[in-house]
Amino acid sequence: MFTVKLLAFMVVAVSLQHLAEATPKVCAGCPVEVDPNREDIKKSLAHVMAAKNSPDELVRIIKASTQVVNGIKYKVVFEVKNPSTNQVKICKTAYVSRPWEYEGYNVLEFGCKA
């Protein structure tokens, strides 16, 4: 009798195993693609552009991601236009926000290509 119960338990356990594996994997600390139209992305990018004394005007944000590090790391790809020449460029930046340490952003990377 014990063998039958054990066998029945094992059959049920094996048949339900797929449910335990169906949960999505969470990757703590991995970059996550976010909506480029989020207000925090727009505001933080405006601060970074001002800190870099960029004469260009933001046209649109193409792609953005965030990552939890010792703060929030933002990576943003965006399009700008020079108001004097109307030249359009694609730019990339990466910066970290640590509001408990300082105001503003620690810019790790900032560059544009025509």
Swiss-Prot record:
Keyword Cell wall biogenesis/degradation: no
UniProt-annotated location(s): Secreted
GO cellular component term, pick one: extracellular region
InterPro entries with a match to the protein in the record: Cystatin_dom, Cystatin_sf
A GO molecular function held by the record: cysteine-type endopeptidase inhibitor activity
Assigned keywords, A-Z: Secreted, Signal
Signal peptide: 1-22
Pfam families per record: Cystatin
Xref: SMART domains: CY
Sequence ranges assigned to domain Cystatin in this UniProt record: 29-83
Principal location class: secreted
Family: Belongs to the cystatin family.
Protein name: Cystatin Pr15a
